[in-house]
C-alpha cells in the first residue's frame, strides 16, 4: 500500500518498524486519502520505542542521513487546536519548523565567534557611562564616592574645554590682528667722481638711496616670539614708488616702482642708484598691504561714522549701529531703512533696502591713501652718516592666533587622555567582574543546593539560546509525548502532502494538467 501511494520505503529502526507501519496503514482510507484518525501505539506484544536523545551526529527517526527535506505539496495551515504545530520527526519539511533542527557544530562555532566579535566591537565604543560605578559597588565600598566626585569634576572640565575650543574656532574665523610699529630707515651714500690720468677714463659722480625697515620689538613679546615673528620689510607693502626730481632725470626716468606679484621674492630693503652730484628731492610712496583689504570712506560718510579707513564688514557694522541707534528702521517693513537728512545727502535716497547697502557703499569706498615720505638725497660728505627714521602703524597677526592653532591641532594631550580612559575602563570592567564573582559566591554560600539547581536551569536556557534549539529533548524522547492530539493531525498532513507530491509528479509525467 505504501508503494501504491507513492512513498519511499524507509528502513525500520529496531522493533519500531512494524508498529510504525501498522499505525500508518491504519491512518489511510481507500484510494490513498486520509481516513479517520486512529490511535497510534505499539503493536500488541511489543514495548514502547524509546529513542536515544538526538544529537548533532544522530539523525531523527524517519529522516535519511545527510539529506534535507524540501517543501512538498501545497502549504498547510496549523492544526485545528490553534498555534503553530511542533511537527515530529519524519514529517515533510513543509510542516517542519526550521528552529527545531539542531545546528551543526560548525554553526555553533560561528555563532560563538560572532558573539566574540560583537563584544570586541562594543568594547571599542566606550562611553562616559561605562566609567560610572554601579550603585551596589558604591554601597559596598564607601571610598568609591571620591572617584564619583572626580568623575563629575572631569565631566564639568570636559564641557568647559569643549566650549572653549568652540569659542577658539569661532575666533579664528575672524581676523585677529594687533598693531605694531614699523620703523622705516631712509639713508643715502654719495660716490664722488674719480678721474684716471693713465687711462683717461674715470667714474661719474653717483648716489645710492636705501629704504629699509623692521618691526620694533614689543616688550610684551618674548625673545622666542620676536624671532619667530620676524618678517621681511617688503611683506608689509603692496607697492613702493620713489619719485625723483623730474627736472633732473626727465619724464621717463624719474619714477622707480615696485609692485607685488604672485611670484615676488620678499626682501629686507630697496636700493636705488643714479648718477648725480647735486642734492635731489624725492618722494617715497608706500602702499600698505592690508589683509583683509581696507578702504577709505567718503569724507561725508567718514564724518558720520567716525571711521577713516577700515574693512568692508566693519564699515557695514558701523552703519548698522548708526541705523539702530537713531531708530531708522521702518517699523512696518523691517527690511527698509528710512534715511535721515545725513544719509539722504550721502546715499541720495529717502528710503532703501538693507540688501542695497553693500551696493550703495561700493561707490563710497576708495583705495586707502599711500604713506608719503619726503626726503632729500644729500651729496654733502658731512650728511653721509645721517639716517632718517619714520614710524608707521602696521597690523600683524596676533601671536595668540598661532597659540590657538597649536592648541586646536595638538594631539599629544588627547592621546594621553585616551590612554588614561582605557585604563579607567579596564579597571571598571575588572571591578564589575569581581562584583559578579562576589555575588556568585555569596549566593552559593547562602543556599548551595538551590543555587546549583538555579544555575543549571540558567545554563540550560543559555545552551538552548546559543544552539538555537526549540523544545524539550527530555520530554520528546518519551513515547507518551507522541500520544497527544496533535500527532494524529500531523501524520495526516504529512501523508497528504506526500500524496499531492506524487500526484503532481504523475500528472507531469503523463502530461495531464488540472483545469
Curated annotation (Swiss-Prot):
Cross-referenced InterPro entries: SMARCD1_SWIB_dom, SWIB_domain, SWIB_MDM2_dom_sf, SWIB_MDM2_domain
Coiled coil: 412-440
GO-annotated biological processes: cellular response to fatty acid; chromatin remodeling; negative regulation of cell differentiation; nervous system development; nucleosome disassembly; positive regulation of cell differentiation; positive regulation of cell population proliferation; positive regulation of double-strand break repair
Listed Low complexity bias regions: 104-117
Annotated region described as Necessary for GR/NR3C1-mediated remodeling and transcription from chromatin, given as residue ranges: 180-515
Keyword annotations from UniProtKB, A to Z: Acetylation, Chromatin regulator, Coiled coil, Isopeptide bond, Methylation, Neurogenesis, Nucleus, Phosphoprotein, Ubl conjugation
Keyword Transcription recorded: no
Source species, domain of life: Eukaryota
One Pfam family cited in the UniProt record for this chain: SWIB
Tissue: Ubiquitous.
Domain annotation SWIB/MDM2: ranges: 290-367
Compartments in which it is found: Nucleus
Alphabetized GO MF terms: chromatin binding; molecular adaptor activity; signaling receptor binding
Modification Asymmetric dimethylarginine, positions: 68, 88
Region (Interaction with SMARCC1 and SMARCC2): 168-474
Region described as Disordered: 1-128
Region (Interaction with ESR1, NR1H4, NR3C1, PGR and SMARCA4): 43-167
Cross-link (Glycyl lysine isopeptide (Lys-Gly) (interchain with G-Cter in SUMO2)): 101
Protein's job: Involved in transcriptional activation and repression of select genes by chromatin remodeling (alteration of DNA-nucleosome topology). Component of SWI/SNF chromatin remodeling complexes that carry out key enzymatic activities, changing chromatin structure by altering DNA-histone contacts within a nucleosome in an ATP-dependent manner. Belongs to the neural progenitors-specific chromatin remodeling complex (npBAF complex) and the neuron-specific chromatin remodeling complex (nBAF complex).
Self-association and partners: Component of the multiprotein chromatin-remodeling complexes SWI/SNF: SWI/SNF-A (BAF), SWI/SNF-B (PBAF) and related complexes. The canonical complex contains a catalytic subunit (either SMARCA4/BRG1/BAF190A or SMARCA2/BRM/BAF190B), and at least SMARCE1, ACTL6A/BAF53, SMARCC1/BAF155, SMARCC2/BAF170, and SMARCB1/SNF5/BAF47. Other subunits specific to each of the complexes may also be present permitting several possible combinations developmentally and tissue specific.
Family indicated by similarity: Belongs to the SMARCD family.
Protein name: SWI/SNF-related matrix-associated actin-dependent regulator of chromatin subfamily D member 1
Species per Swiss-Prot/TrEMBL record: Mus musculus (Mouse)
Amino acid at each position: 500500500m505504501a508503494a501504491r501511494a507513492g512513498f519511499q520505503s524507509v528502513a525500520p529502526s529496531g522493533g519500531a518498524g512494524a508498529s510504525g507501519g501498522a499505525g500508518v496503514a491504519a491512518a489511510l482510507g481507500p484510494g490513498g486519502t486520509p481516513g479517520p484518525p486512529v490511535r497510534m501505539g505499539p503493536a500488541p506484544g511489543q514495548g514502547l520505542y524509546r529513542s536515544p536523545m538526538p544529537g548533532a551526529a544522530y539523525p531523527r527517526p524517519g529522516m535519511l542521513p545527510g539529506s534535507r527535506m524540501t517543501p512538498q505539496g501545497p502549504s498547510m495551515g496549523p492544526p485545528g487546536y490553534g498555534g503553530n504545530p511542533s511537527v515530529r520527526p519524519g514529517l515533510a519539511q513543509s510542516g517542519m519548523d526550521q528552529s527545531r533542527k539542531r545546528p551543526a557544530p560548525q554553526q555553533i562555532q560561528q555563532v560563538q565567534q560572532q558573539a566574540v566579535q560583537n563584544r570586541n566591537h562594543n568594547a571599542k565604543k566606550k562611553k562616559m557611562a561605562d566609567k560610572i560605578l554601579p550603585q551596589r559597588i558604591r554601597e559596598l565600598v564607601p571610598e568609591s564616592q571620591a572617584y564619583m566626585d572626580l568623575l563629575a569634576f572631569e565631566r564639568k572640565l570636559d564641557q568647559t574645554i569643549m566650549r572653549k575650543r568652540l569659542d577658539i574656532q569661532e575666533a579664528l574665523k575672524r581676523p585677529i590682528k594687533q598693531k605694531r610699529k614699523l620703523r622705516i630707515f631712509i639713508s643715502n651714500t654719495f660716490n664722488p667722481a674719480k678721474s684716471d690720468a693713465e687711462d683717461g677714463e674715470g667714474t661719474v659722480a653717483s648716489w645710492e638711496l636705501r629704504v629699509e625697515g623692521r618691526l620694533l620689538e614689543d616688550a610684551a613679546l618674548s625673545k622666542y616670539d620676536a624671532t619667530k615673528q620676524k618678517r621681511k620689510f617688503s611683506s608689509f607693502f603692496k607697492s613702493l614708488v620713489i619719485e625723483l626730481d623730474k627736472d633732473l632725470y626727465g619724464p621717463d626716468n624719474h619714477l622707480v616702482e615696485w609692485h607685488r606679484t604672485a611670484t615676488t621674492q620678499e626682501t629686507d630693503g630697496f636700493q636705488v642708484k643714479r648718477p648725480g652730484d647735486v642734492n635731489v628731492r624725492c618722494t617715497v610712496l608706500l602702499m600698505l598691504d592690508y589683509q583683509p583689504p581696507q578702504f577709505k570712506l567718503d569724507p561725508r560718510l567718514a564724518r558720520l561714522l567716525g571711521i577713516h579707513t577700515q574693512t568692508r564688514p566693519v564699515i557695514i557694522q558701523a552703519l548698522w549701529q548708526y541705523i539702530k541707534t537713531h531708530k531708522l528702521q521702518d517699523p512696518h517693513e523691517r527690511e527698509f531703512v528710512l534715511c535721515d537728512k545725513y544719509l539722504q545727502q550721502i546715499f541720495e535716497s529717502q528710503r532703501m533696502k538693507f540688501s542695497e547697502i553693500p551696493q550703495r557703499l561700493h561707490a563710497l569706498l576708495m583705495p586707502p591713501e599711500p604713506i608719503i615720505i619726503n626726503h632729500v638725497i644729500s651729496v654733502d660728505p658731512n650728511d653721509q652718516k645721517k639716517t632718517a627714521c619714520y614710524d608707521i602703524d602696521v597690523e600683524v597677526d596676533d601671536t595668540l592666533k598661532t597659540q590657538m592653532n597649536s592648541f586646536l591641532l595638538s594631539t599629544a594631550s588627547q592621546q594621553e587622555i585616551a590612554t588614561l580612559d582605557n585604563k579607567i575602563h579596564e579597571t571598571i570592567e575588572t571591578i564589575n567582574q569581581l562584583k559578579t564573582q562576589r555575588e556568585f559566591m555569596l549566593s552559593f554560600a547562602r543556599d548551595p543546593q538551590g543555587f546549583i539547581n538555579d544555575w543549571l536551569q540558567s545554563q540550560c536556557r543559555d545552551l538552548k539560546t546559543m544552539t538555537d534549539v526549540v523544545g524539550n529533548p527530555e520530554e520528546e524522547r518519551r513515547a507518551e509525548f507522541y500520544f497527544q492530539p496533535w500527532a494524529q493531525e500531523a501524520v495526516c498532513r504529512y501523508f497528504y502532502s506526500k500524496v499531492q507530491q506524487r500526484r503532481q509528479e504523475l500528472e507531469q509525467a503523463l502530461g495531464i494538467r488540472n483545469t
